[in-house]
């Protein structure tokens, strides 16, 4: 099964005050921690104004959301990845989850069966749909949702066959799924840094 690894980094980062993807933590931009978990061969979903910065940092595969869905949130990024990069299995990580480990990503991929449209981890009782694995067949549902301007990821998940799996069932720690929304969050995740 051909896998496409995708970092979602097209958000506006309003609460953070600057593009989160490039915020430096432990010597490198946040998105590079996600890349470390996904592997070097990643597709980065960006937005106008940020694409050039990724290219300047040496990234080769950087896309912006397809018009007319630009600025429509993570569903647009997921759809764009599936529309522009041919694969069967898409592994997504939001750029603001720097603690996710490579072992966790590998374990989530192994959970996807032919009966599943997606594998979504659950940490501390909350689904984590932006650090998850999706089969290509969900692309049509993404398209329908975008066409109807129904941008809630929970609505999308309700329409597909999701295998929800507790983080500890795949050897993951709940803290791996903490996302950075404010600059102060960088200090709060410090105790969980494995290095």
Curated annotation (Swiss-Prot):
UniProt-annotated binding residues for GTP: 8-10, 20, 65, 96
Subcellular location as annotated: Cytoplasm
Keywords (A to Z) from UniProt: Cytoplasm, GTP-binding, Magnesium, Metal-binding, Molybdenum cofactor biosynthesis, Nucleotide-binding, Transferase
GO terms assigned for molecular function: GTP binding; metal ion binding; molybdenum cofactor guanylyltransferase activity
Reactions performed catalytically: Mo-molybdopterin + GTP + H(+) = Mo-molybdopterin guanine dinucleotide + diphosphate
A Gene Ontology cellular-component term: cytoplasm
Taxonomic superkingdom: Bacteria
Enzyme Commission designation: 2.7.7.77
Required cofactor(s): Mg(2+)
Main location: cytoplasm
GO biological process, one term: Mo-molybdopterin cofactor biosynthetic process
Enzyme class: transferase
UniProt cross-references to InterPro entries, sorted A to Z: MobA-like_NTP_Trfase, Molybde_CF_guanTrfase, Nucleotide-diphossugar_trans
UniProt binding sites for Mg(2+): 96
Pfam families, alphabetized: NTP_transf_3
Signal sequence extent: none
Alphabetical list of HAMAP family matching this protein: MobA
Entry's family note: Belongs to the MobA family.
Swiss-Prot/TrEMBL domain comment: The N-terminal domain determines nucleotide recognition and specific binding, while the C-terminal domain determines the specific binding to the target protein.
Role summary: Transfers a GMP moiety from GTP to Mo-molybdopterin (Mo-MPT) cofactor (Moco or molybdenum cofactor) to form Mo-molybdopterin guanine dinucleotide (Mo-MGD) cofactor.
Name this polypeptide is given: Probable molybdenum cofactor guanylyltransferase
Organism, scientific name: Bacillus licheniformis (strain ATCC 14580 / DSM 13 / JCM 2505 / CCUG 7422 / NBRC 12200 / NCIMB 9375 / NCTC 10341 / NRRL NRS-1264 / Gibson 46)
Encoding gene, per UniProt annotation: mobA
């Amino acid at each position: 099964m051909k896998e496409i690894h995708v970092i979602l980094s097209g958000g506006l980062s309003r609460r953070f005050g600057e593009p989160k993807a490039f915020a430096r933590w432990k010597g490198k931009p946040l998105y590079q921690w996600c890349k470390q978990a996904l592997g070097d061969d990643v597709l980065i979903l960006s937005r106008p104004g940020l694409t050039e910065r990724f290219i300047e940092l040496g990234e080769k595969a950087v896309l912006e959301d397809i018009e007319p869905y630009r600025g429509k949130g993570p569903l647009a990024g997921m759809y764009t990845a599936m529309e522009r990069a041919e694969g069967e299995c898409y592994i997504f990580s939001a750029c603001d989850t720097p603690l996710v480990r490579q072992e966790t990503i590998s374990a989530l991929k192994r959970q996807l069966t032919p009966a599943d449209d997606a594998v979504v981890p659950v940490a501390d009782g909350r689904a984590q749909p932006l650090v998850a694995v999706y089969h290509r067949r969900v692309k049509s549902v993404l398209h329908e949702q975008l066409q109807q301007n129904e941008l809630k990821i929970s609505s999308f998940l309700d329409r597909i066959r999701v295998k929800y799996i507790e983080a500890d069932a795949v050897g993951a720690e709940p803290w791996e799924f903490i996302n950075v929304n404010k600059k102060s969050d960088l200090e709060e995740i410090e105790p969980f840094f494995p290095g």
